[in-house]
Amino acid sequence: MKPDILIADSIQTLYNELNESSPGSISQVKDCTMTLMQLSKSQGITVFVVGHINKDGNIAGPKVLEHMVDCVLYFEGDPNTSYRLLRAAKNRFGSTNEIGVFEMADCGLIEVPNPSQMLLEGRPEGAPGTCVACVMEGTRPVLAEVQALVTKTTFNVPRRAADGFDFNRAVLLMAVAEKRANMKLNVFDAYINVIGGLRLDEPGADLPVVLAVASSYRDQVIAEDLVAIGEVGLTGEIRSVSNMNQRLAEVSRLGFKKCIIPRNSSEKLEIPAGLSVYRVKNLREAIETAL
């Protein structure tokens, strides 16, 4: 019998009897992976190799394992939610800038065709410190909620924390906000969180992060039907990002009525009907528009 798909779970427990080393060793992992790869190429069988991860979230064992295979996928997500993200770290035959969103249901994993709607579920009404971002995950625009909490510090050095957003980038953006938007954050702790387990790694998420911080700092609410898109520079300018028309179409499709974007957008914009677009030049102007 020739199967269409072969799943090896896990590569660290497989062993070759001709190899005297213990299962999980470097030589065993290499030998077993090579055997599976030869079987896949010669018989035309799709092989999935499941591997353990270490405490840092990387694949455990020798790096040669990642070099031997055609595609490396990470299955990740918040253990407190039922949603899981499938990310590609390596793809020999396509782009790695794509994600798959799934939900763990009673019948197993099911696809989430509209991840933006999922990530915006349960948004608080009338709460300061929250702003909606629109980022590109590969070729797909995704909307996500960014939350911030700014509170008076009790420490000599104010605390900074970020979940779902690069920590160093968050610290940089708060420094820009303090310098260019007159926000005295040096006596406040600041915490940033991206809802739904999504990680925002692209420049278009800069502006919504700063607006969420400003909203919590001023204790003023950002309109629930507003989305912010833009990169923040060190001088406080709001810079353009790519795929603006796709982002605006997704914003409109999900029922949002307002969108703050950079004034100097390089694309010829096609603004959807019913969507009000506010073009801003710098951070101070963006904060005043949003609040």
Ranges and model annotations:
Residues 1-5, 11-63, 67-291:
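Peripheral, non-AAA+ core regions of ATP-driven protein-machinery
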